Design a protein with these regions (language model features):
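Membrane-proximal, glycine/serine-rich, low-complexity loop/turn segments characteristic
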Residues: 20, 43, 61-65, 85, ...
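Structural motif
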Residues: 27-38
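Short, acidic Ser/Thr/Gly-rich low-complexity loop/linker segments typical of extracellular
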Residues: 49-63
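Outer-membrane beta-barrel translocator domains and adjoining extracellular loop/strand segments
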Residues: 209-211, 274-280, 341-358, 399-409, ...
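Face-selective signature of the C-terminal outer-membrane beta-barrel domain
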Residues: 324-338, 368-403, 409-577, 588, ...
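Conserved C-terminal beta-signal and adjacent last beta-strands/turns
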Residues: 745-764, 774, 778-878
Length: 878
């Protein structure tokens, strides 16, 4: 019996071994530029080269995977494609990873006229052909990107694909711009671009391409042949009235295989916000934030060119040198000098659980000056076996603000310096990955706020609040991962150090003596008690040591499914001004993603986070954050825990030009601290109290975009619904606040004829807020509509007419609806382009804006720029 059982087990083992088969996977890349080769056919043949034993196709990252369960000892692997030379390789019949290099061999079709599709797809790469979207009115590539389904471009130049921001912006496969690519979006000439490639689930580290994929896309600009390796430059001058206005721009660029550069200068006082579009990074890093400031008008929901009074100079230098195939150097420098003024009236209405609301009215006038300098130097090696990155950054921001509110004057000054260094070294040996990371950062931010007519004491004529923040951070990381078939096992260890200092002092000056240390301040006894001197100072040091162990396991079936479970455990030792404590912080996460079909993709995620507060949430002494607000925290580091569950579906069909997505997210946060505020006339005191509380968030969104090529029309639409519930304390009463919001947007861009194209965009928002389980205290409906018409006649002449409409239901009278109109005429001949623009033709003097948050209603009446005329002359140097 045992002999039969042994024979059966041997046969079963042999059968299972044969059924399991072997796995052959790897990447295919182009020899010319080492870029991934998408859409390449990868086939397995027997030794006779006739019988096909396996077939696959590379995805957008050039990855492929084949399975073979036969008995042959060796096989023939063949790579074919319409734009590559066929390549064959004899390989052993065993589990292996292959890196295949192919050369291009374009297919030429003679005397054939084919109407090109506007977009196509190969694996994870979606290609948009610029010529199918561009018209005579498009100057920068950002103008064309707005017409491509699935791609959205913000006014700042930030790009999102299918509702998610991109993680890289390439020009001919080279990453020169980094996180500040808005300058390229708004300046690279549309006429120089042949196609735009979107790499879905893009992994920027080549050594991890077939191991770890992301859920973000990257965008790559492919140049026309005549735009490669040549200098393109332009200069523009402009003058206008009313008031006296000027504009000056200079631009130079060159893109080749070994060298890329983009040089810009822009200056104006016409209200063009170059700073947010081309200077400031989209992803603000964890720098020190200002704690003080002057009270200014809130930003209204209209285009900044309509109300921004500025005087700006901005210059940038961006250069990238490719030393060899995978080694490059990036150098960047940016300088900004900006002065902005604003005037208007604001009203803040505070609602309470019981009793009538309190309304605070202010006449605000402000002047804000900024000088900013950013420098970055980076050397990077990015190959399929080795990733090395060494970067050094310097950021300096010098701000000064002068403001008045009635009889109160405010002067704020801050100087921020940030130095950063990043070193990353990652090595791949087969399916095993080793990496070392070391980040260090030093930041310093001294601030001073001078306030006259001090509101918190009748005996004080002037107050001076000083705050100095300083921080040093170091992050060190070791990582090891190994792949076994469909499984990846990864472990990461961190040893982090953080040292933060916060010093503050409030000094006062009365009418009889000079500046001195503040004595106790007296308040309305109904809500306040006297504040002693020692509560007006802070001298804090926060030291942290983190030892983090992050194990992760991943099961990867390729496109159909990938599941990743990570469980970071952070042991944190904190020392606060001599007092030590320790705790564990947990951040587990489970993600399951993949392709349900060739066109439909899914992503499901569950995560839990433990977060500990920073030093700016620790101080217990009062700080005068602006002229009418005193704030303090509990003196204990706040802790927040959160649980989030999300799901997302993405659909794309390049043949029909349809791209869509839908997402749903729920989260709950638990906090051990709550903010309490007391309002006494125009004075506001805010403090943090130790109290357990929680908040809930629920959000659903839908995005869809469709290209109708026969109509030369692109339609983008989105809808977002959100619900939030949280707790606050006001006038010593605990209140549960509920806020619901619905936002919708639709944009249509169409070319009606060879001489007429139009753009329409409409957005609406409905926000209601109030106490939970009660009728909403307020509901705001907001509508914006914009219509643009471009008429081209006799080729060089273009007429541009635009009209814009705003509606806010909480505003009464004639200001409930606001209309703006503009008209411009441009003429182009040879290298010159002349434009004459008339702005704000209907000449509304003010704009009324209302918004709500946490049972507070903010309304402002802001002075607008007057009707004006601007003449510009642009000269193309190459």
């Amino acid at each position: 019996m045992s002999r039969w059982l042994l024979t059966y087990l041997l046969l079963l083992s042999s059968f299972m071994s044969m059924a399991q088969g072997i796995v052959i996977h790897g990447t295919v890349r182009f020899k010319e530029d080492d870029e991934p080769a998408a859409g390449v056919n990868v086939m397995l043949f027997g030794q006779d080269r006739k019988s096909m034993l396996g077939f696959g196709q590379t995805d957008g990252n050039g990855r492929f995977r084949l399975e073979y369960s036969g008995t042959a000892d060796s096989l023939v692997l063949r790579c074919t494609g319409m734009d590559i030379k066929m390549q064959e390789r004899r390989i052993p019949a065993s589990d292996q990873r292959l890196d295949i290099i192919v050369t291009t061999s374009p297919l030429v079709i003679r005397e054939a006229k084919v109407k090109a599709d506007p977009m196509s797809a190969k694996g994870d790469t979606v290609v948009y052909y610029v010529g199918q979207f561009r018209d005579e009115t498009d100057r920068a590539i950002g103008d064309v990107l707005k017409k491509m389904p699935g791609i959205t471009v913000e006014e700042s130049g930030r790009i999102a694909y299918n509702g998610k921001p991109i993680n890289r912006f390439y020009i001919e496969g080279m990453d020169m711009m980094g996180k500040s690519y808005g300058v390229a979006t708004n300046n690279v000439r549309a006429e120089d671009i042949a196609s735009v490639e979107v790499y879905e689930r893009h992994q920027p580290v080549k050594a991890l391409e077939d191991i770890e994929r992301t859920d973000q896309a990257a965008l790559n600009l492919r140049l026309k042949d005549d735009a490669k390796g040549v200098w393109n430059a332009m200069a523009q001058l402009g003058a206008g009235y009313k008031p006296a206005m000027w504009n000056a721009e200079g631009l130079g660029m060159r893109f080749s295989k070994a060298f890329q550069t983009l040089l810009t200068y822009k200056g104006n006082n016409e209200g063009e916000d170059v700073a947010s579009k081309e200077v400031l990074p989209f992803e603000q890093t964890d720098d020190l934030a200002e704690m003080l400031g002057i009270r200014t008008l809130s930003e209204p929901s209209i285009d900044r060119t309509k109300y921004l009074f500025n005087n700006l100079h901005a210059a940038s230098v961006n250069a990238m040198f490719k030393l060899r195939k995978n080694l490059d150097i990036v150098a960047k420098a940016t300088y900004l000098k900006d002065r902005q003024t604003a005037d208007g009236v604001t009203s803040t209405k505070y609602f309470f659980k019981d009793g009538p609301p309190v309304e605070v009215n202010e006449n605000l006038s402000s002047v804000h000056s900024t000088n900013r300098a950013d420098l970055e130097f980076k050397i990077r090696n990015n190959s399929s076996k080795h990733y090395l990155n060494e970067s050094v950054e310097f950021n300096g921001v010098w701000n000064e603000g002068l403001g008045t509110s009635g009889g109160v004057s405010q002067l704020h000054h801050s100087d921020k310096i940030v130095l950063k260094n990043n070193f990353t070294d990652l090595v791949r040996l087969g399916s095993t990955v080793f990496s070392v990371l070391s980040d260090s950062e030093y930041a310093r931010l001294p601030e001073r706020l001078n306030v006259s007519s001090f509101l918190f004491s009748d005996s004080v004529a002037e107050a001076v609040q000083r705050v100095k923040s300083e921080r040093f951070k170091m992050t060190n990381e070791l990582r090891f991962s190994v792949n076994k078939g469909n499984w990846q096992f990864r472990i990461t260890g961190n040893a982090n150090l953080s040292i933060e200092n916060l010093d503050s002092e409030l000094s006062v000056c009365d009418t009889d003596s000079g500046l001195q240390e503040a004595q106790s301040l007296s308040f309305d006894k109904k809500h306040y008690t006297d504040i002693p001197t020692d509560s007006l100072k802070n001298d804090l040091t926060l030291q942290r040591i983190d030892v983090v162990l992050s194990p992760a396991i991943e099961y990867n079936l390729g496109d159909p499914m990938k599941a990743t479970l990570s469980f970071p455990v952070d042991y944190r030792l904190s020392k606060i001004s001599g007092t030590s404590n320790n705790r564990f912080l947990l951040t587990p996460k489970l993600t399951v993603s993949g392709d349900a079909t060739n066109n439909l993709r899914y992503n499901i995620s569950v995560s839990y986070n433990d977060i500990e507060g920073e030093i700016n949430g620790l101080y217990s002494g009062y700080i005068l954050t602006d002229y009418r607000m005193l704030a303090r925290k509990s003196g204990v580091l706040p802790r927040t825990s959160s649980l989030a569950v999300s799901g997302r579906l993405e659909y794309k069909n390049p043949v029909s030009g349809l791209v869509a997505s839908a997402a749903l997210r729920w989260s709950r946060s638990w906090r051990d601290m709550i903010f309490s505020s007391v309002i006494d006339g125009s004075r506001l005191q805010e403090s943090a109290l130790a109290m357990d509380n929680h908040s809930d968030n629920l959000q659903a969104s839908i995005n869809a975009a469709k290209r109708f090529q026969s109509l030369s029309t692109t339609i983008n639409a989105s809808l977002i619904w959100s619900l939030n519930e949280s707790s606050i304390i006001r006038q010593s009463s605990l209140m549960s606040v509920r806020r619901a919001n619905v936002q919708g947007r639709i944009t249509t861009l169409t070319k009606l004829s060879s001489f007429l194209n139009m753009e329409y965009s409409g957005s609406l928002s409905n926000t209601s807020s109030g106490l939970s389980k009660c009728e909403p205290l307020s509901s705001i409906f907001y509508l914006r509509q914009y219509l643009l018409t471009n008429i081209t006649f006799r080729k060089p002449w273009i007429i541009r007419a635009e009209i814009e409409h705003y509606l806010n239901n909480l505003i009464s009278g004639k200001d409930r609806n606001t209309l703006f109109a503009g008209l411009s005429l441009s003429y182009k001949k040879n290298r010159f382009e002349y434009s004459l623009a008339a702005r704000n033709l209907l000449n509304p003097k003010i704009f009324n804006h209302i918004q709500t948050s946490d049972l507070i209603e903010y309304s402002s009446i802001r002075t607008l720029r007057p009707a004006s005329v601007m003449l510009k002359i642009l000269f193309n140097l190459g």
